Amino acid sequence: MKESFKVCFCCVRNFKVKSSEPPEEIKNLFHDYSQDDRMSADEMLRFVIQVQGETHADINYVKDIFHRLKHHGVFHPRGIHLEGFYRYLLSDFNSPLPLTREVWQDMNQPLSHYFLYTGHNSYLTGNQLNSNSSIEPIVKALRNGVRVIELDLWPNSSGKEAEVRHGGTLTSREDLQKCLNVVKENAFQVSAYPVVLTLEDHLTPILQKKVAKMVSKTFGGSLFQCTDETTECFPSPESLKNKILISTKPPKEYLQTQISKGSTTDESTRAKKISDAEEQVQEEDEESVAIEYRDLISIHAGNRKGGLKNCLNGDPNRVIRLSMSEQWLETLAKTRGPDLVKFTQRNLLRIFPKTTRFDSSNYDPLVGWIHGAQMVAFNMQSHGRYLWMMQGMFKANGGCGYVKKPDVLLSNGPEGEIFDPCSQNLPIKTTLKVKIYTGEGWNMDFPLDHFDRYSPPDFYAKVGIAGVPLDTASYRTEIDKDEWFPIWDKEFEFPLRVPELSLLCITVKDYDSNTQNDFAGQTCFPLSEVRPGIRAVRLHDRAGEVYKHVRLLMRFVLEPR
């Protein structure tokens, strides 16, 4: 078969198109585990156990594989030929991730023992300056498994009602009741585990009282309310199933927060706002407002009193949620990494993007995760490598939006030493061997001239580990020129110190010597979820949506030290 590409107006370039065929190693494996060019069910079972590492498999498991292959027209009653074996290896039921979306981790520990799928400014459709506010991003986030939704609450133009908007910008406004309604309707569509509604509160006490009634009426029995402000331990995700938790600053901390934010506001204007707010507090029945609003709050957000020096001291009698910017986190990670880990063993730590990310870009989530930060807040409307890592992390544990932190972040050493993710002395625990054989499906999911106008694509792949600094590494294959079905046949090794905090990131691009290389697919997933063996790795687009046909054939081997 040939493909023709026009060059200018009169010339035509012809390229021979190869079909997808098994690499030599796959052919050899088939011959090793088959007889007379057919692989029987018993021989397939031996392959599945010995090569794929599926020790739980039995003959019925293999018969199910054979049954599925009937739909590909490559099945024979006496077994499968090489083509059928290759189709099995590239099939959806040979994924590197678990085939069923089941929650398998212990969900009975405190909330602080889990990473939570967390959104930032969840109502924005685009940039942070002048995009629209809408309920649609909230719906999409919840249906994608996000468990922490953030709403910024401000007085409307009349000052008589609360509305959702990004204050100090030209973004549009959204009705608070609409936002609450879609949270209620979509909170538990894909996961029964609790949704945390983070309210960034810029309201007067009068409006706080109105919001308290609105929230209580909307969520009713789904609203989890904890009257004990001095709880020493957060409840577990299991005990909070189908519950909505409110996290915000208690009313008494509202004025303190406004004062601390004064660096970007004119002093006289800020002083007048504080004075007006103080008068309202005095004029209203402060106690009743505080009680109504406090009763909503089940995760109390504490102030960062004392700056960098004292913010991680914690309180042995009370757990809180502390928020800090990515910049503050980076500073603390360099100087007080173990203190961050210790703080997050009991308390919740929320990280948010720096204020200069006007384009709604994101930051490296691993900096927060390797230090135990549970709520690494992301702009879900922005695409790129860091969002792929976020999406990859929360493929774990059945995609329920909660991933249990590894023991290294929760337990101290025999002499009380706390894990330091940036240590240069971490021992190697295991070696990951990743072999990338080939890829297929681009010719079915993309137009003929999508990558190159005058020739088939020149694909190469990048394979990397994102984790603690010593584990982070990336490699790339050679470029396979003019091929819709690239064959790389390349193996990479990754010595890993903390594999339980590692993400495997894979990207494919089309090389172009004159312009920027074209994106051709990506995927990312936790190493803790990977099934060893030869697997079909499906790729996703920039937004994280899976392609229908594009996939890679890869092999994963973990060798403990």
UniProtKB/Swiss-Prot annotation:
Domain PI-PLC Y-box: 294-410
GO molecular function: metal ion binding; phosphatidylinositol-4,5-bisphosphate phospholipase C activity; phospholipase C activity
UniProt binding sites for Ca(2+) 1: D452, D458, D510, D512
Domain PI-PLC X-box: 105-249
EC number from the UniProt entry: 3.1.4.11
Ranges of compositional bias, category Basic and acidic residues: 267-276
Name by which UniProt lists this protein: Phosphoinositide phospholipase C 1
